């Protein structure tokens, strides 16, 4: 299924914002961390599934993915 780029971007922005709150980061720091550890790719590639999850579960899934790629949060 094809998803609109706008939907993916809006969801990604929301995930970054919630990630920042959860880990006490600025949104800029959260974006850089998630991007560096390939979490943005994870969101984009798995949008079809991840956007159906509970929002906190989606943030946790992205955090786990980032940890698997060297992140420490």
Language model features: what each stretch is:
Residues 1-73:
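C-terminal alpha-helical interaction appendages
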């Amino acid at each position: 299924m094809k998803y609109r780029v706008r939907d993916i971007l809006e969801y990604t922005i929301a995930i970054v914002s919630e990630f920042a709150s959860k880990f006490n980061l600025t949104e800029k720091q959260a974006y850089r961390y998630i991007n560096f550890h390939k979490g943005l790719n994870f969101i984009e590639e798995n949008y079809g599934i991840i956007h159906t999850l509970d929002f906190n579960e989606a943030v946790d899934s992205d955090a786990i993915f980032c940890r698997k790629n060297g992140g420490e949060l």
